[in-house]
Amino acid sequence: MAPSRKFFVGGNWKMNGRKKNLGELITTLNAAKVPADTEVVCAPPTAYIDFARQKLDPKIAVAAQNCYKVTNGAFTGEISPGMIKDCGATWVVLGHSERRHVFGESDELIGQKVAHALSEGLGVIACIGEKLDEREAGITEKVVFEQTKVIADNVKDWSKVVLAYEPVWAIGTGKTATPQQAQEVHEKLRGWLKSNVSDAVAQSTRIIYGGSVTGATCKELASQPDVDGFLVGGASLKPEFVDIINAKQ
């Protein structure tokens, strides 16, 4: 990892937790050592964004797990970047595979959300990744490049974007891409950014890995030159998240 890219660890709590156990988790995180060269962001369920921001130490940022593409309006059940900021969160996760494949969000919609969130001043954790049948068909590169292009077309300022590569077959399955598989895709993504955006953006943009990251797998993954951190699901609700935060130490 280039010295200019600050290690980034995101915890996606998904639709889990209640105030009691999340409060206990937050107490653990607040007591944890967060290295100065590591950025940590937690994404609670929408109902708990305010709660998390009030309880978490300021050294840990808060993200929403999703947002809509406009500021206000008749969009029942949606939240806007402006509302997210109003609750004290500074990041949003967009394009997560569960949004794509469970809720049917298209590349186009995700691109529009990215553009709006950035225009409103939020940082964006933009997720991409292939399904198992796509990997087995040998089209991983094609799929992730197409997804990345739609995101890139909607980004003016890359300093507020973290790209999260999440092979869908490795999310919540206990299967992790090998460090070599992760590095190979991350390296190709950086090459795509260099060819299609700029060398400067390719060098400075953090590309993080998501997909069954645990305290046991994180150190070897973090040692890969193009793996700049993690987006962690299940393990982010457990004390081992602290080990993942310290994967580079």
From Swiss-Prot:
Keywords: Acetylation, Cytoplasm, Gluconeogenesis, Glycolysis, Isomerase, Isopeptide bond, Lyase, Methylation, Nitration, Phosphoprotein, Ubl conjugation. The modification Deamidated asparagine is found at N16, N72. Substrate binds at N12, K14. Its EC number is 5.3.1.1, 4.2.3.3. Triosephosphate isomerase is an extremely efficient metabolic enzyme that catalyzes the interconversion between dihydroxyacetone phosphate (DHAP) and D-glyceraldehyde-3-phosphate (G3P) in glycolysis and gluconeogenesis. It is also responsible for the non-negligible production of methylglyoxal a reactive cytotoxic side-product that modifies and can alter proteins, DNA and lipids. The modification Phosphothreonine is found at T173, T214. Gene3D superfamilies: Aldolase class I. One of its GO terms (biological process) is canonical glycolysis. HAMAP family: TIM_B. It comes from Oryctolagus cuniculus (Rabbit). The modification 3'-nitrotyrosine is found at Y68, Y209. There is a cross-link at K142 (Glycyl lysine isopeptide (Lys-Gly) (interchain with G-Cter in SUMO1)). Asn-16 and Asn-72 undergo deamidation which gives rise to four extra negative charges. These are expected to decrease subunit-subunit interactions and so expose the hydrophobic interface to the aqueous environment. The modification Phosphoserine is found at S80, S106, S159, S198, S212, S223. Pfam families: TIM. GO terms for molecular function: methylglyoxal synthase activity; protein homodimerization activity; triose-phosphate isomerase activity; ubiquitin protein ligase binding. This is Triosephosphate isomerase.
